[in-house]
Amino acid sequence: VQCNFSQYSSKYQRYKDHIQTNAFDPNFNGGALMDINVYNLHFVTGLFGKPKDVHYFKNVGYNGIDTSGIVIMEYPDFIATCTGAKDCSSPYTVYLQGDQGTLIVSGASSGVCKDVFFDAPKKDQIGKKAVDTKEKISIEQPNHMLYECKDFMDIILNKDDKAYTTYKEQTQMVVELLEKLS
């Protein structure tokens, strides 16, 4: 599993000029882990639950804040990497790779799963012309925040304790991971 949510912060140049804003202030829990990589952690834990161990390797700015970093999440049968950056930009993409193929999800870690592809294994391609085996399996999505608001509203109106507990437990799990990694 590879998640990447790298978004060049509009405040990063000011930070490089030593003008500190909340987004890069350790006293306000600024930084890449808390502000950006948290979305990757939610994505991975939402699919696979709590990892057996986690590690954070970060690029540190002049005031000790993490401007970018990679969380390594260890599961019994695989490793997940979560890249979060405020000092550079990259397409927001998640790769779920296995011996049966790869799911490529554009925008997943930011909450927008606008394009989903399945890429079948290519076998041994050395010396052979590459063949594009991607198949688009996306579904149309309305505004990406709409489903969250609808879920919250349904949980409250229907007093859905099971869904409430599921979301609460996932959030608590992510908070515990953030505290361990900070």
Q: For each predicted feature, which ranges?
A:
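Short, flexible active-site-adjacent loop segments at beta-strand->alpha-helix junctions, enriched
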Residues: 4-9, 86, 109, 122
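Interdomain hinge/lid region at the active-site interface
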Residues: 129-137, 141, 148-151
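C-terminal helix-rich "cap/oligomerization" subdomain common to oxidoreductases
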Residues: 136-137, 150-182
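A short glycine-threonine-serine/GTX helix/turn-capping micro-motif
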Residues: 27-34, 134-143
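Extended amphipathic ligand-handling, pore-lining, and cofactor/metal-binding catalytic surfaces
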Residues: 125-127
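Predominantly a Rossmann-like dinucleotide-binding segment in NAD(P)-dependent oxidoreductases
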Residues: 1-55
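Short, solvent-exposed polar/charged micro-motifs at secondary-structure junctions
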Residues: 10-14, 63-68, 93, 174-177
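Contiguous beta-strand/loop segments that form the cofactor/metal-binding neighborhood of enzyme cores
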Residues: 36, 40-113, 119, 142, ...
